[in-house]
A protein has these predicted regions:
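Conserved phosphate/anionic-ligand binding catalytic regions in large, soluble enzymes, centered on
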Residues: 1, 51-52, 211-213, 217, ...
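Short, well-ordered loop/turn and helix-capping segments at boundaries between secondary-structure elements
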Residues: 163, 224, 254, 270, ...
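Composition- and surface-driven signal marking solvent-exposed, interaction-prone regions
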Residues: 214, 262-264, 300, 323
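Active-site phosphate/pyrophosphate-binding segments
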Residues: 3-35, 129-247, 257, 315-332
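Peripheral docking tails and interdomain loops at the edges
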Residues: 290-332
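Glycine-rich phosphate-binding loops that contact phosphosugars or nucleotide phosphates
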Residues: 21, 31-179, 204, 239-240, ...
């Protein structure tokens, strides 16, 4: 896991070297006629899809729906997706429900795009277009570089669809930022994680997918019940469960969500909740000197993954082989 985290910068650089192919796909899709975008993925790929959703909605102003593959596989109900943009994200490209959902979407008249690591896979075969992650083989059960790769590949596609030069510039800076992020030391979290009964990971907007991804890794690698949620949702029911044994990890982006996140962070501090904040002038977790809010949700995964891996080893767990899990998960 540790070595694969360190490979993330090169994975992303390799994706961006394929930019002409991504631009060609964007031109062939013809986004202007799409009534909506549907994003399909499970687990970590689903979290990458949440990040993609916010990019699509804020850059393309296109409403995004999260696909429920069981509508196709269990309920056998094909959806009305004519002219929709359907994006499926998968590391292995082999899960039967994702294959079926992609096949059904294409048959319904959607423009289907597969963001996959395994380009020779059933999901890739069913899609009209393929955007490769270029991550190479991943040996650890826990996905890291493929998650970062799928988020970067999705962002690159949106940048081309939108003709967004600012996003393209941020993506150009991303490999170097990922490389620098490997040196960030988040060890201040370790003690709280080791004694926690549960963990809440919160963010807003573009950071929500990463919050959910970090929570998944806490459950998967540290065997610690964790929930990733919107900082806005944290203020509803979940807030009642906060205590000295339920630390909150919060990610703050330097964008339109910053004011709300700052206010919530201050309130949690007053209530003596164990808060670990990344980003902003009040952030306790080491962060890069400058902000790139459109890609920071990707970069923040690097120090988060590293501290989870390190804490797992300190607790006597094998971060590369969590119990009862396999590298490829096939659902129906």
């Amino acid at each position: 896991m540790a070595s694969e985290i360190a490979e993330s910068a090169e994975v992303v650089a390799k994706i961006f070297r394929n930019r002409p192919a991504t631009r060609d796909i964007a031109q062939r899709i013809g986004i202007g006629s799409a009534p909506l975008c549907v994003v399909c993925g499970r687990g970590s790929s689903g979290h990458a899809g949440v990040y993609l959703r916010y990019l699509v909605e804020t850059r393309l102003r296109l409403p995004v729906s999260a696909s429920a593959p069981s509508v196709i596989t269990a309920f056998r109900t094909p959806l009305l997706l004519r002219h929709a943009l359907f994006i499926v994200i998968s590391q292995s490209g082999r899960s039967p429900d994702l294959v079926a959902a992609t096949r059904s979407a294409r048959a319904a008249g959607a423009r289907t795009v597969a963001i996959v690591n395994a380009t020779s896979s059933p999901v890739a075969d069913e899609a009209e277009f393929v955007v490769p992650m270029e991550a190479g083989q991943e040996h650890s059960v826990a996905a890291t570089k493929t998650v970062i790769g799928s988020m970067a590949a999705g962002a690159a596609l949106v940048a081309e669809l939108a003709g967004d030069r600012a996003l393209q510039s941020a993506l150009d800076r991303l490999p170097a930022r990922l490389h620098r992020a490997v040196a960030l030391d988040w060890s201040e979290i370790s003690d709280d994680l080791a004694k926690a009964s549960a963990v809440f990971v919160a963010a807003r907007g573009l950071g929500l997918g990463s919050a959910r991804e970090i929570a998944l890794k806490l459950s998967e690698i540290l065997r610690l019940p964790s929930i990733g949620l919107s900082a806005a949702e944290l203020q509803h029911g979940p807030r009642a469960a906060l205590s000295s044994r339920t630390p909150v990890i919060m990610m703050r982006l330097m964008d339109e969500t910053a004011v709300m996140v700052d206010a919530l962070a201050e309130e949690l501090r007053r209530q003596k909740i164990a808060l670990h904040l990344c980003g902003g002038p009040q952030g306790s977790l080491p962060w890069l000197a400058e902000d790139d809010p459109s890609t920071d949700p990707i970069t923040m995964l690097v120090p988060a993954y590293r501290i989870i891996e390190q804490t797992a080893r300190a607790c006597g767990f094998d971060p590369d082989r969590p119990p009862r899990l396999s590298k490829i998960t096939e659902t129906y």
